[in-house]
Structures are given as C-alpha cells and as structure tokens.
C-alpha cells in the first residue's frame, strides 16, 4: 500500500484514474478546502487534480475555476468529475456541472462533457475566494438544453463518455479522425419519455482550435453555459426511440468503451 496524496483543510478526494502511459499520473476529484454552509462538496463544487508519481509537486489542478463575470475562457465554473486520460496521456475528458447555472436554477445546471487540453495553463484573477488556476485549457464539447424538444436530437444531459480508439477512428471516406469522444445523451421521445442514446464529437487536431469562440461564448455568461469551441458539434449515433426497449441502460451505471481501432463502442 502506498499513499500518494492526503487532502487537508477538510477537503476530501476520490474517484482516481491512472494515466495509460509513463510517467505514472493519478487524476482524481478534489473537494473544496475549508467547506462551509455556502460552499461544500457538491456536483458543482469540485475540481480535478493530478499527482505525478515521479514529481514531488503535490496535487496540481487540472481545471481552473472562474466565478466572476466576465468569465474566463479556458476556465470552468464549478464541478468536474471522473477525469479520464486519453490513450496517449496528453489530455483528459470529464463530466461537468456548472455553479453559475445551478444558482440560476437547478434545471439549468445540466451535466455536460468537457475536455482538458495542454494548450496553456489558465490563470484566474481570483476575485472570488473559491476561484483557482489550472494547468490545462478546459472547454465543453457537448451542448445541452433545459427542455429538449420531443423527438429531436436535443439533450439535457451528457455523461459517461469515452475516448474513441487509441488513435481515433477511420471515417467512411477513408480519412483518419485523430481525436473523438462518444458519450451518452438524454433525449426526450415523442411520447415524452427520457431515452438515453449515444452521441459522437469529433475534436480538432490543433489544440489552439479549442480556444476559438463559436456562436456562443466559450466562457459562458451569467445566464448561459460555457459553449464548445468553433466547429465542435455532437452527432447522434444511435436512435432507439421506436424500439420496444429504447435507450442505453442507466442501471447498472457504466461508461462507454471503444475498441482500440475506434470502429466499435460497447454499451449496455
């Protein structure tokens, strides 16, 4: 048994994942230090950290947190969860809940999928006592709405993602897509029932592309979630609305998994 990190100041840690390549790094959830009645562990009050087995740097923040408007691109605004390294260990994916939207109303705090890329470290002005810096540039890669239109591809939750292939996947035209993530998304059927299906997001090769703003602000606003970068869009892979037993199972809870070649996704 080996202790790699011990939380202090009333914080707690958990849900560790390990980098698939050297150097050995452990990524895990870190709850807030000095929790109080206003700010304690919750879906929207947690961050990701990394401990490097070969370096004595303690826990290094993955995601920065920006809680004062105007919000900062590359930082997020709340809670990250289940941080999974890419097959080459250069970046991570995770699920995300937003503090600002939670304060606006629980229905607006939809779970999403985000990514941390090694574009640059993000420094935050720290105008709020719960703001902090992060070593990775983080953005959302999924888009949700509070109330999906019945029978549409709109979702109100994105979760339980996976990296596609060890080197991405081969598209129908024979070209290679280097980076992609699949996730489960909750749609609403024409009859008004929740149906969980699988969605795919192709990601850019150039990390700088994650900093390019699209139609909506990367950093979010006081009334909107942070948005994916320019050109990042989710597509629906499965549509099970009309099956006798529609949807991906939520119980037992599980995460999607890709074949090494990226030509298949396993799910229940």
Task: Please annotate each region the language model reported.
Residues 1-268:
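Sequence signature of WD/YWTD-type beta-propeller architectures
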């Amino acid at each position: 048994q080996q202790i790699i990190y011990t939380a202090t100041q009333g914080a707690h840690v958990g849900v560790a994942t390990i980098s698939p390549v050297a150097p050995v790094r452990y990524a895990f959830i870190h709850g807030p230090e000095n929790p109080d009645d206003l700010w304690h562990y919750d879906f929207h009050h947690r961050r990701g950290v990394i401990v490097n087995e070969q370096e004595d740097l303690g826990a290094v923040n993955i995601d920065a947190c920006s809680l004062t408007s105007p919000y900062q691109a590359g930082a997020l605004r709340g809670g990250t969860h289940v941080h999974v390294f890419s097959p080459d260990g250069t970046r991570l994916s995770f699920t995300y809940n937003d503090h600002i939207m939670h304060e606006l109303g629980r229905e607006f705090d939809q779970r999403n999928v985000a990514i941390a890329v090694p574009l640059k470290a993000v420094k935050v002005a720290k105008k709020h006592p719960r703001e902090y810096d992060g070593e990775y540039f983080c953005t959302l890669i999924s888009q949700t709405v509070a109330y999906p239109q019945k029978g549409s591809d709109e979702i109100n939750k994105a979760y339980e993602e996976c990296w596609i292939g060890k080197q991405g996947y081969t598209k129908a035209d024979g070209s290679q897509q280097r980076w992609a993530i699949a996730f489960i998304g909750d749609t609403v059927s024409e009859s008004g029932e929740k149906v969980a299906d699988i969605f795919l997001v192709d990601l850019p090769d150039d990390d700088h592309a994650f900093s390019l703003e699209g139609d909506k602000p990367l950093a979010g606003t006081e009334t909107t979630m942070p948005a994916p970068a320019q050109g990042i869009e989710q597509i629906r892979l499965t549509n099970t609305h009309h099956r006798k037993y529609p949807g991906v199972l939520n119980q037992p809870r599980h995460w999607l998994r890709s074949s090494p070649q990226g030509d298949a996704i396993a799910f229940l």
